[in-house]
A protein has these predicted regions:
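Flexible gly/pro/ser-rich segments immediately N-terminal to CXXCH heme-c attachment motifs
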Residues: 124
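Short, exposed beta-strand-loop hairpins at the edges of beta-sheets
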Residues: 141-146
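Repeated scaffold domains used in trafficking and secretory/extracellular systems
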Residues: 130-132
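Beta-propeller domain segments
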Residues: 4-120, 128, 138, 150-151, ...
Length: 159
């Protein structure tokens, strides 16, 4: 399977499995997991070593499965994501919600079955490392932080 550092797994509304991978400096990935696919680590990476030298891997290799999204140039330090399937935020139906240590909560519009485009940044003003997001029974979001004063946050429209 060749995955570097799985940060989170989630299923989308079609039952497909997605993996968020914490890459080396830069190069965090979102992968759609398919049986028998090779995601390339350590031979393929978009990131670089922490001393800013290029990583061993190359960008693309025939036969390897490329990520759906790659986060460059800096790392997001992604957490456990969720695809939104609630009612509280109807415009987000099917969108990917991705918590991050460094960028808050990212919302990716899902078009053609895959998240893409530029994310909307949410909760960045909290200055907290976001670890996980889950969708509650009424569509509210529950976001877990992991600082020493960590908390479980409930996010509803207007909050």
């Amino acid at each position: 399977m060749c995955i570097r550092d799985r940060s989170g797994l989630t299923f989308d509304g079609n039952g497909e499995l997605w993996n968020v991978e914490d890459g080396p400096h830069g190069g965090d990935e979102l992968n759609l997991i398919k049986k028998g696919a090779n995601y390339g680590w350590i031979d393929v990476t978009q990131g670089q070593h922490y001393n800013n030298e290029p990583a061993k891997g190359v960008k693309n290799v025939p036969g390897m499965t490329n990520p759906v999204l790659t986060y460059l140039p800096n790392s997001l330090n992604p957490g456990n994501p969720a695809f939104y399937d609630g009612a509280a935020f109807p415009a987000w139906k099917g969108d990917l919600l991705l918590p991050s240590f460094t960028k808050g909560l990212l919302r990716y519009d899902t078009q053609g079955g895959k998240p893409g485009g530029d994310p909307e940044y949410l909760l960045g003003d909290l200055k907290q490392r976001l670890r996980s997001v889950n969708v509650g029974p009424k569509g509210e979001l529950y976001v877990l932080t992991d600082e020493t004063d960590g908390a479980l946050l409930k996010v509803t429209p207007g909050s």
